[in-house]
Regions:
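Multi-pass, polyprenyl lipid-linked donor-dependent membrane glycosyltransferases
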Residues: 36, 122-127, 149-188, 211-221, ...
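Interfacial juxtamembrane loops and adjacent helix segments
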Residues: 50-105, 110-113
Length: 381
């Protein structure tokens, strides 16, 4: 197919077809699938809808309407009468409160929709956003091979919004954030130093901070950018490099404010996690059994392999911008894998965020480099 525009339209339509199939499948979902985490996320949303911003306080004393107890009773949980036995709730030593262990982000987003009809709109909007990013990559691509890669990855990214992202309500917003951060990372670090601007970097830091409000482990997603900014400052010792790093860090903290406020209210300190005392919190310890579990998960293993391949391709590229992004992405992968491979529990979606972030970053780096090259050639001509 010689006409790039025709090829772009073909793959955009393929992504649209996948989007339609996914939305149709999601439309039949139930909000009562008997998963403990689902109930806790929906309880946080219920608190925000009842109390507004006071919904940050998730103490079980606020369940005076019996919302969460009735949910656990409906699924046959034997300890539904005992607050201390409720899943994904922990007792905080500093306040004595029995609170939800998860960050408030999923509940805040779910609270935007009417009770009883919250999950499907969350997944619909997130999947539509991923489709939009896929189209952005497709139409930014210039070479036929890049258009094909962007289109195929777009179809895959939309497919992933059900399998395995359906496993947790924290994952749909995380998937969208990974796509946005992949784009912003290239805008911030894929250009020469003289062309770097503060605004995209501040936005990137803020969005990375927001990701922590959905999953605490998402804090590691910003490790590559943080490491790059630190090394850049240590090498140059320029005030400009310091200011860039400081702006990124401040924006990161600003994005995390909902989680910090939640911690402060529920634990008595913004630096004390509500996961304290949770049975799912285990010490870091490298074991081959965890590695084997991830390798046996074909989807996670395949996505990580693609992420590594894309990162290596960027690192070996001749263009300086691509190489910088490749180095940054490599650092990000190493730090994230170091954490998850030493965490004693392997779950079907734990490595999905770092894989998506790496793949979106690699994709946008490639297609945006083609755009810049085309512009430079046009100016030369």
């Amino acid at each position: 197919m010689k006409n790039p525009l025709t090829l772009k339209i073909v793959f955009a339509v393929l992504c649209l077809l996948m989007l339609g199939l996914q939305l149709r499948s999601m439309s039949g979902w139930s909000e009562s699938r008997g998963v403990f985490d689902d109930i806790c996320y929906l309880r946080q949303a219920h608190l925000f809808q009842r109390f507004g911003l006071a919904g940050f306080d998730t103490d079980m004393s606020r369940d005076d309407d019996g919302y969460v107890r009735s949910k656990f009773r409906e699924i046959g949980f034997p300890g539904w009468k005992d607050d201390k036995e409720l899943p994904c709730h922990n007792t905080m030593a500093g306040t004595g409160k029995i609170v939800i262990q998860y960050p408030p982000g999923p509940g805040m987003v779910l609270a935007l929709f009417p009770e009883g009809h919250q999950v499907v709109p969350l997944f619909w909007l997130s999947t539509i956003a991923v489709f939009a990013f896929a189209c952005l990559a497709i139409f930014r691509a210039r070479k036929p091979a890049s258009i094909v890669v962007a289109g195929l990855f777009g179809v895959l990214a939309i497919y992933l919004m059900i399998n395995p992202i359906k496993a947790s309500y924290s994952m749909p917003p995380t998937a969208v954030i990974c796509a946005l951060c992949g784009y912003l990372t290239v805008r911030c670090f894929g250009v020469p130093e003289a062309d770097r601007r503060f605004a995209p970097l501040v936005i990137l830091g803020f969005v990375f901070g927001l990701s922590v409000d959905f999953r605490l482990a998402n804090i590691f997603l910003c490790s590559g950018c943080s490491l790059f900014l630190l090394v850049d400052f240590l090498k140059s010792r320029h005030a400009q490099s310091f200011l860039r790093g400081a702006a990124f860090a401040l924006a990161l903290v600003a994005g995390m404010l909902p989680t910090l406020v939640s911690y402060w209210i529920n634990t008595g300190s913004p630096l004390t996690s509500t996961y304290h005392g949770a049975p799912t919190v285990v010490p870091l310890d490298f074991t081959l059994s965890v590695v084997w579990e991830y390798l046996n998960d074909i989807l996670q293993a395949a996505l990580l392999a693609l992420s590594i391949a894309g990162t290596v391709a960027l690192w070996l590229a001749r263009q300086g911008g691509l190489r910088r992004v490749g180095q940054l992405t490599a650092g990000n992968l190493v730090i994230n894998l170091a954490f998850f491979l030493t965490y004693g529990i392997a779950v079907s979606y734990y490595t999905i965020p770092i894989s998506l972030l790496s793949l979106w970053t690699s994709l946008f780096a490639s297609v945006m480099q083609e755009t810049e090259t085309a512009r430079a050639e046009a100016v030369t001509d």
